[in-house]
Amino acid sequence: MSQVSICLLSEAGADPGALSILAERWGLVSDEQSIMALVLTPERLELRKRDEPKLGGIYVDFVAGTLAHRRKFGGGRGEAVAKAVGIKKGYLPRVVDATAGLGRDAFVLAALGCHVQMLERNPVVAALLDDGLRRGYQDAEIGPWLRERLTLLHASSLTALAEIEPRPEVVYLDPMYPHRQKSALVKKEMRVFQSLVGADEDADGLLAPARALATKRVVVKRPDYAEPLAGIAAQAAVTTKSHRFDLYMPLL
């Protein structure tokens, strides 16, 4: 993985030595001119857009906030993502989430009992995920099962999908796509994320290796207005008001 330049900041009360360890681990080079900043606070690691401070920080939190609410009060196995990967009574597929992002869908699947391996190639996003996992693993309530079911591999999906063993039943893809939704959360996250990583220009190339790896199905999450990944029509789909989960059979 090549090095990435980003402004690295440590707030008062945070361990000052932790930032240099983090930079070395993830191949980050501090650039004080960068508009993107990775900020170590006493509580967590955050990504901030320095020229738009009102956007606040983006961070991964598996313990509290929206994911905790979704785990406790969401649709459970009735959630569209659960239906899409094929969760049924007595069947919990092993899943590779090849475009992990902030890990939301991966966490939902892990909370339902699936073993999920997240792949994330961007070192800044991987660092945020790793920080969220570390705090989640330490939590008394979710830590025991989270450690067992949700893991992270910092790698390019294009290469990792050809090397993962054993083969999972499901490969899950949610490549970044320009959002039309105007919700505050989506706007904030998309603006910060697209400033950091840009669009997934090579996303079309993920479908074939994903279908070669999965033993049961590939699930591709798309906005309802988006064309199929790689222009290949899905064999089935699970739809919601704003998204669809396109389903593809493996390439045997």
From Swiss-Prot:
Enzymatic class: transferase
HAMAP family cross-referenced by the UniProt entry: 16SrRNA_methyltr_J (MF_01523)
Similarity remark: Belongs to the methyltransferase superfamily. RsmJ family.
Gene3D superfamilies for this protein: Vaccinia Virus protein VP39, YhiQ-like domain
Keywords associated with the record: Cytoplasm, Methyltransferase, rRNA processing, S-adenosyl-L-methionine, Transferase
E.C. number: 2.1.1.242
Domain of life: Bacteria
Pfam families noted in UniProt: SAM_MT
Catalytic activity line of the entry: guanosine(1516) in 16S rRNA + S-adenosyl-L-methionine = N(2)-methylguanosine(1516) in 16S rRNA + S-adenosyl-L-homocysteine + H(+)
Name assigned to this protein: Ribosomal RNA small subunit methyltransferase J
Molecular functions (GO terms): rRNA (guanine-N2-)-methyltransferase activity
NCBIfam families assigned: PRK10742.1 (NF008012)
